[in-house]
Structure formats: structure tokens, C-alpha cells
From Swiss-Prot:
<protein>
    <recommendedName>
        <fullName>Uncharacterized protein HI_1552</fullName>
    </recommendedName>
</protein>
<dbReference type="Pfam" id="PF04301">
    <property type="entry name" value="BioG"/>
</dbReference>
<dbReference type="InterPro" id="IPR007398">
    <property type="entry name" value="BioG"/>
</dbReference>
């Protein structure tokens, strides 16, 4: 995987695991708490995180979409101050708890520049949000195609769940990728669930990182 590190000589760290195909800049507007660094993880063609976490006193995790499944594997055994899931589950390719298998497989098999744009329109919901999302520097098409190919294969082989303890989950009421019903079904007995008005890409509704775990 790739990482983008924002080093403010902080004592604490926020670890953000992005969704598949999404630009790291999609969370750039969120204001960091005092004394925190930020590490953004993305491009999951492999699950190797080459970063020393041991220097930090507290680590908070925020994982979006496919990042929930990835974070569970990467952060097993790491002590977390909190773990927040946003519009994702630990079973991302699943008819009852994630994206239905046929839709996931179809997205991969039919992926083109054009269908990618349609997907991004679906995660944003309306035209204005989509146009704002398009201002983020887009990741190369070949890269996101390889990423989804790798993720699909890894997810079929590894269906373990509950590898880390999640403190809370956000569920967008109009999510067209991970349906709210499937998300609620997955998280109901696992952690506190907060439903929010919005689409799959919901970070535009927040101004501060801390609002994702303090509510």
C-alpha cells in the first residue's frame, strides 16, 4: 500500500484508511486535533504498511469503505485509542453485510474510465458534490484497476472478522455502495452506530477529525 504522512511532530497519530480508488486529498479539509500527526493509507495492491507506529502515545483509526477490511488486517495487535468505521464493514463483498458479490464482481469486470466516473458520481450522490470531488487529483486508472483486482482476490481468500475492536461506525442514510441496511446488520451487535444524512462519500459533512469519534 501507499502512504501519505503529515508530520507535525505530534505525540499522537490519526491513521486514515481510504476507500478503494479514492484520492488521499478527499479528507484534506478535516482539521487535525492539537499534537497529532496524520498518516493516510491507500492503494491496497498489497497490505504491507511500512511505518513505525511505536513512537506514538495514542493512535486513532478512521477507516472508510474498503479501508475497514484492510485496517482489520493491518492493525491486528496494535493498541488503538479508538477505531471508527465510515460506510464500510468487515465483510465488504457479501450479499447481507457488504456489497453484493455480483455487484462487486461486475464493478471489477466492467471497469473503464467511464464506469469509474459513474462510480464516483454514485459515491457523491448529487452533481454539485460530484463536481467538487472531481477537483481532487485523480489516481491513475491502471493503479485503481490493479487495486480492485488485488482486493477482490484477497477478500475471497480471507473472510475473517472482528480482528480489531471498533468503537463506533457511521452509516450514511443514502449510501449507494454499502447499503444502510447491510451496514446496520453488520454493526448492530458490534459497536455504537450513528446514522448520518449523506452519501457514501460523507467527509464533506465534517470539518474536524475529532467529530468522527466525539459525538
Amino acid at each position: 500500500m501507499k502512504t501519505k504522512f503529515y508530520d507535525y511532530q505530534g505525540e499522537h497519530l490519526i491513521l486514515y484508511f481510504a476507500g478503494w480508488g479514492t484520492p488521499p486529498d478527499a479528507v484534506n479539509h478535516l482539521i487535525l486535533p492539537e499534537n497529532h500527526d496524520l498518516l493516510i493509507c491507500y492503494d491496497y495492491q498489497d497490505l504491507n504498511l511500512d511505518f513505525d507506529l511505536s513512537a506514538y502515545r495514542h493512535i486513532r483509526l478512521v477507516a472508510w469503505s474498503m479501508g475497514v477490511w484492510v485496517a482489520e488486517r493491518v492493525l491486528q495487535g496494535i493498541r488503538l485509542k479508538s477505531a471508527t468505521a465510515v460506510n464500510g464493514t468487515g465483510l465488504p463483498c457479501d450479499d447481507s453485510f457488504g456489497i453484493p458479490y455480483a455487484i462487486f464482481k461486475g464493478t471489477l469486470e466492467n471497469l473503464t474510465e467511464n464506469t469509474r466516473l459513474k462510480f464516483e458520481r454514485r459515491i457523491c450522490g448529487d452533481k454539485a458534490s460530484f463536481e467538487r470531488y472531481q477537483l481532487f487529483p485523480a489516481r491513475p486508472f491502471d493503479e485503481i484497476h490493479q487495486e480492485l483486482t488485488a482486493l477482490f482476490a484477497m477478500i475471497q481468500q480471507d473472510k475473517r472478522i472482528d480482528l480489531i475492536h471498533w468503537a463506533n461506525a457511521w452509516v450514511s442514510s443514502r449510501d449507494k455502495i454499502f447499503t444502510p441496511a447491510n451496514q446496520h446488520q453488520y454493526w448492530a451487535l458490534r459497536c455504537a452506530v450513528q446514522e448520518i444524512e449523506g452519501e457514501h462519500y460523507v467527509f464533506s459533512r465534517f470539518t474536524h477529525w475529532s467529530a468522527l469519534w466525539d459525538h
